Amino acid sequence: MKRPIHLYIFVILSSIASILRLFSAFVSTFNEEQLRASMQGAAGINVEELILVSRETANLQTSMIQKIAAIVMFGLLIAVIVFLFMKKNELASYLYIGYLFSTLLLNTYNYLAGKGVAQLYSDAAFRDVTAATMLGGYIINIVLFAIYFGVTVFFHLRKPKEQPSTAINSTDI
């Protein structure tokens, strides 16, 4: 039986992203003093507004929804890895598709919640640039989802299904 090399590669890349997501949800902190010190000499920037937006962004990244999603998605990847090692490639493929849809849901949530945070800017130019940046990131995430999903489904549908062997269990003479 051929190994699903594409799934191994996708799981490795997704594991890196999932570890970064766990780090962002559980370990990252907002340091107001450091941000204030780095923006001290900047001209044309409302430092208090930037700190407010940065604080709300940090709160969004470390919210309970982010933590639960990070744990669930990491658990899905662990399950995919376990089933790949058990040579249950079809089940691993289904679980990975579930992981992909959970990333799509989380990215949609992050985009919609981020739009609310961007509204905290009083300057329309900052709001527009922030909204455009978030939209660009969301589009990139959708494109990556489409690529990963398309390749996974293509190889899943292309391979022959695992059929139980009747030769071993046969009692006919």
Q: What residues fall within each predicted segment?
A:
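Topology signature of small-to-medium multi-pass alpha-helical membrane proteins
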Residues: 1-173
